[in-house]
Amino acid sequence: MELNPTEKDKLLIFTAGLVAERRKARGLKLNYPEAVAFISAALLEGARDGMTVSELMHFGTTLLKREDVMDGVPEMIAEVQVEATFPDGSKLVTVHQPIV
């Protein structure tokens, strides 16, 4: 299987997001990279499901709560940005203050 660098990046995000999802399901608090991966993967999947950029920007703020992550993580993540593929091309999705 041949993958270009963008496809490899998306596969890595998905894999890290899946690990984070499983850890969250087991009741573990997510660390910084896990939280970013969890949010990023959900945004990519939301774009694939047909959500718009503005819908994703709101959706990204509903995924994790302060109780889901380790102490200090919400303050470390001021924003999450991911380049998602939409029917009309790739767009940058930015979620400000994703964990409240």
From Swiss-Prot:
Enzyme class at the top of the EC tree: hydrolase
Catalytic reaction annotation: urea + 2 H2O + H(+) = hydrogencarbonate + 2 NH4(+)
Biological or metabolic pathway of the protein: Nitrogen metabolism; urea degradation; CO(2) and NH(3) from urea (urease route): step 1/1
GO cellular component, one term: cytoplasm
EC number: 3.5.1.5
One BP annotation, GO: urea catabolic process
Localization: Cytoplasm
Pfam (any one): Urease_gamma
Gene3D superfamilies per record: Urease, gamma-like subunit
GO molecular function per UniProt: nickel cation binding; urease activity
Predominant location: cytoplasm
Superkingdom of this protein's organism: Bacteria
Keywords tagged on the record: Cytoplasm, Hydrolase
UniProt cross-references to InterPro entries, sorted A to Z: Urease_gamma, Urease_gamma/gamma-beta_su, Urease_gamma_sf, Urease_subunit
Matching PANTHER family: UREASE
Family: Belongs to the urease gamma subunit family.
NCBIfam families in alphabetical order: PRK13241.1, urease_gam
Name of protein: Urease subunit gamma
Species in which this protein is naturally found: Acinetobacter baumannii (strain ATCC 17978 / DSM 105126 / CIP 53.77 / LMG 1025 / NCDC KC755 / 5377)
Taxonomic classification: Bacteria, Pseudomonadati, Pseudomonadota, Gammaproteobacteria, Moraxellales
Gene this protein is translated from: ureA
